[in-house]
Amino acid sequence: MQVPRLKLLMGSGAMFVFAIIYGWVIFPKILKFMISKQVTLKPGTDVRELWSNTPFPLHFYIYVFNVTNPDEVSEGAKPRLQEVGPFVFDEWKDKYDLEDDVVEDTVSFNMRNTFIFNPKETLPLTGEEEIILPHPIMQPGGISVQREKAAMMELVSKGLSIVFPDAKAFLKAKFMDLFFRGINVDCSSEEFSAKALCTVFYTGEVKQAKQVNQTHFLFSFMGQANHSDAGRFTVCRGVKNNKKLGKVVKFADETEQDIWPDGECNTFMGTDSTVFAPGLKKEDGLWAFTPDLCRSLGAYYQHKSSYHGMPSMRYTLDMGDIRADEKLHCFCEDPEDLDTCPPKGTMNLAACVGGPLMASMPHFYLADPKLIADVDGLNPNEKDHAVYIDFELMSGTPFQAAKRLQFNLDMEPVEGIEPMKNLPKLIMPMFWVEEGVHLNKTYTNLVKYTLFLGLKINSVLRWSLITFSLVGLMFSAYLFYHKSDSLDITSILKENNKVDDVTSTKEPLPPTNPKQSTTVHPVQVPNTLIPGTNPATNPATHLKMEHRERY
């Protein structure tokens, strides 16, 4: 029976081509198509439900820089800072008043963040610790008036002395009062200067202040924003074009901002940071619009990583160097004058929040070294202060992330306000926050068993097919190689069979008498084609064998 060499060759070749095309072309396209149909913000989908009401809290950490030498700093000395924290909160995110536009393939919603103190995770801290910070109303207010409304300085200075009697440049208060419960602002005075100062509270210009009665307000960094509207977004649903999933097209019902000098900086780029499109390329980066900064920030690919045994991509970001990057000059006060640009690694938030605040990475990580040298107590490092995201590109899933941001006061002396006239000019760290998420196995298993299991099966299948096809190709090549020698091999086999037949037909020799001497003569065998079997040339055939009887 002959082996079908041609069929084996063709079958193995076809298997090899199929493994390549299916494993690297067809299957990935099928998988991407299935993901694109599932990962949308269409009502009724699992992704829509998870996106609109996150079923687990994010971890929110607050670290405060306690000023240990406030009196010396008030006289121009170098600040000494002590980091206190973390104060831990559970941050719940939800979206309400959702409105779909099927024609535009968008959904509009209001974002709401709710912070709940986690005393167990905060231990040994309690939140009742007293912290010394730059006065959160006097210093920003005095600096803003000096820069923008210097003619009103005398009126403001008198009003501050009435609303905050005996106030100093630095305020000592409990952490929870500073950040959530609020510090008291007394606007009960009938003095004209006090009433003029309190106007900004009554009109709502001070967004961090909450009115508790007709004459009193409570000011806190985050209390007013807790469980309140964080802005109305309009984003793409990704039904018609999956690549636009989550893309911000409007914020506060505007298609672009009107904050920065140049239009490019006012453009919305990326998502609302709670959802990303699947199938991104690593060089695309991860872009998100951040209302707190009135700016879109992009994270860039750093290196490969893994999370719970699943491969992912590590992304990171920083504030960049606005002065050195021409594309970022629109974040300068005057894009034509680079001297108005903030230092490397910082961003001026005055146009965004209306006060002399600067944003940076914690501890001025990746910022101008001079900023670190201006104060004592900072120790920037990548592990604790870098922003990172471990992201799975195909499904668009962030496995874990840490968004870190530091808020600083752009401090300077104010001649018209007595407690502030000798302050040093520097960028003063106040506090920094970290918003983190680490998906547990309940959610990572959804990706693991729907995506990575399919990828693993495809990998095993395609490499198995390639292995079998290569074995088949090698075996068929072996058969074709020996095809030219088949005649010689057949002849040899036939002659071997002839020799066996001749040997089997010989008559047996008569038994020898042990008492007689016997001479054995060789039998003449016809010459064969097998070399070495010709008796005429074999010396063994001339040997004479004798048996003698022993007595």
UniProtKB/Swiss-Prot annotation:
<keyword id="KW-0812">Transmembrane</keyword>
<dbReference type="GO" id="GO:0043025">
    <property type="term" value="C:neuronal cell body"/>
</dbReference>
<feature type="compositionally biased region" description="Polar residues">
    <location>
        <begin position="528"/>
        <end position="540"/>
    </location>
</feature>
<feature type="disulfide bond">
    <location>
        <begin position="294"/>
        <end position="352"/>
    </location>
</feature>
<feature type="glycosylation site" description="N-linked (GlcNAc...) asparagine">
    <location>
        <position position="66"/>
    </location>
</feature>
<dbReference type="GO" id="GO:0035073">
    <property type="term" value="P:pupariation"/>
</dbReference>
<feature type="transmembrane region" description="Helical">
    <location>
        <begin position="460"/>
        <end position="480"/>
    </location>
</feature>
<keyword id="KW-1133">Transmembrane helix</keyword>
<comment type="similarity">
    <text>Belongs to the CD36 family.</text>
</comment>
<keyword id="KW-1015">Disulfide bond</keyword>
<keyword id="KW-0552">Olfaction</keyword>
<feature type="disulfide bond">
    <location>
        <begin position="265"/>
        <end position="330"/>
    </location>
</feature>
<dbReference type="GO" id="GO:0050911">
    <property type="term" value="P:detection of chemical stimulus involved in sensory perception of smell"/>
</dbReference>
<feature type="topological domain" description="Extracellular">
    <location>
        <begin position="29"/>
        <end position="459"/>
    </location>
</feature>
<keyword id="KW-0325">Glycoprotein</keyword>
<dbReference type="GO" id="GO:0030425">
    <property type="term" value="C:dendrite"/>
</dbReference>
<keyword id="KW-0716">Sensory transduction</keyword>
<feature type="disulfide bond">
    <location>
        <begin position="332"/>
        <end position="341"/>
    </location>
</feature>
<dbReference type="InterPro" id="IPR002159">
    <property type="entry name" value="CD36_fam"/>
</dbReference>
<feature type="region of interest" description="Disordered">
    <location>
        <begin position="528"/>
        <end position="551"/>
    </location>
</feature>
<protein>
    <recommendedName>
        <fullName>Sensory neuron membrane protein 1</fullName>
    </recommendedName>
</protein>
<dbReference type="GO" id="GO:0005929">
    <property type="term" value="C:cilium"/>
</dbReference>
<feature type="glycosylation site" description="N-linked (GlcNAc...) asparagine">
    <location>
        <position position="213"/>
    </location>
</feature>
<dbReference type="GO" id="GO:0055088">
    <property type="term" value="P:lipid homeostasis"/>
</dbReference>
<dbReference type="GO" id="GO:0005044">
    <property type="term" value="F:scavenger receptor activity"/>
</dbReference>
<feature type="transmembrane region" description="Helical">
    <location>
        <begin position="8"/>
        <end position="28"/>
    </location>
</feature>
<dbReference type="Pfam" id="PF01130">
    <property type="entry name" value="CD36"/>
</dbReference>
<dbReference type="GO" id="GO:0005737">
    <property type="term" value="C:cytoplasm"/>
</dbReference>
<feature type="topological domain" description="Cytoplasmic">
    <location>
        <begin position="1"/>
        <end position="7"/>
    </location>
</feature>
<comment type="function">
    <text>Plays an olfactory role that is not restricted to pheromone sensitivity.</text>
</comment>
<feature type="glycosylation site" description="N-linked (GlcNAc...) asparagine">
    <location>
        <position position="440"/>
    </location>
</feature>
<feature type="topological domain" description="Cytoplasmic">
    <location>
        <begin position="481"/>
        <end position="551"/>
    </location>
</feature>
<feature type="glycosylation site" description="N-linked (GlcNAc...) asparagine">
    <location>
        <position position="226"/>
    </location>
</feature>
<keyword id="KW-0675">Receptor</keyword>
<dbReference type="GO" id="GO:0005886">
    <property type="term" value="C:plasma membrane"/>
</dbReference>
<keyword id="KW-1003">Cell membrane</keyword>
<dbReference type="GO" id="GO:0007166">
    <property type="term" value="P:cell surface receptor signaling pathway"/>
</dbReference>
<keyword id="KW-0472">Membrane</keyword>
<dbReference type="GO" id="GO:0071444">
    <property type="term" value="P:cellular response to pheromone"/>
</dbReference>
